Amino acid sequence: MKMKVLVFFVATILVAWQCHAYDMFPLRMNTGYGARTPEVKCASWRLAVEAHNIFGFETIPEECVEATKEYIHGEQYRSDSKTVNQQAYFYARDLEVHPKDTFVFSIDGTVLSNIPYYKKHGYGVEKFNSTLYDEWVNKGNAPALPETLKNYNKLVSLGFKIIFLSGRTLDKQAVTEANLKKAGYHTWEKLILKDPQDPSTPNAVSYKTAAREKLIRQGYNIVGIIGDQWSDLLGGHRGESRTFKLPNPLYYIQ
């Protein structure tokens, strides 16, 4: 009798586990690294993106459009951006500044906000259209990300060199310079844009790694890197830097 009860108990546990196995892993993906999540918990999905546990996605989950919209336009996004920028400043203010000590910033999603573009294109649920995005960039109306602008001004006042390293292409130099100044970024050491004809840098990580290597050869001491994409922060030739990842749940750049 005891044996029958034990067998029944074990069988009940196994059935229950099978029924609820999916619930234990609510972020398990159907395809890719996160393009479709059938019962996604959007705050958890966003955290996994920021922690680089979900990557390589082309679009955000359809179920998360409203949650993403609320996050981007709510207090949390601004607070998250503020916290990251504050930590960069707290780190910087304790350093002894030397003439070629440099902070490297990405541009889109880091110093200039592209939320106005994504607001018109589904907050990341639409696949990226480079033609439409370039048209938006060429208008030169991207606003500053306010917490980054505050941090930028503090770093400049401390005496750090500022270098903007962007995936924008060389043909956008004039509009990018004008947009930066219009948004309040009044001075910088270098603005580095991508040569689309260069076959040696097929993706963002290799391009930004090569650019940092060149900066180090030129004598710059990279003490900090600030970006909204992991491709801004990964790779070699980061000098003695700390890296600071700003929030961006809208898209992923390889």
UniProtKB/Swiss-Prot annotation:
Residues 22-34 form a propeptide. Glycans are attached at residue 129. It comes from the Eukaryota. The keyword Endoplasmic reticulum does not apply. Keywords: Glycoprotein, Seed storage protein, Signal, Storage protein. Residues 1-21 form the signal peptide. Accumulates in the stems of developing soybean seedlings. NCBIfam families: Veg_Stor_Prot. PANTHER family: ACID PHOSPHATASE-LIKE PROTEIN (PTHR31284), VEGETATIVE STORAGE PROTEIN 1-RELATED (PTHR31284:SF19). May function as somatic storage protein during early seedling development. Belongs to the APS1/VSP family. This is Stem 28 kDa glycoprotein. The gene is VSPA.
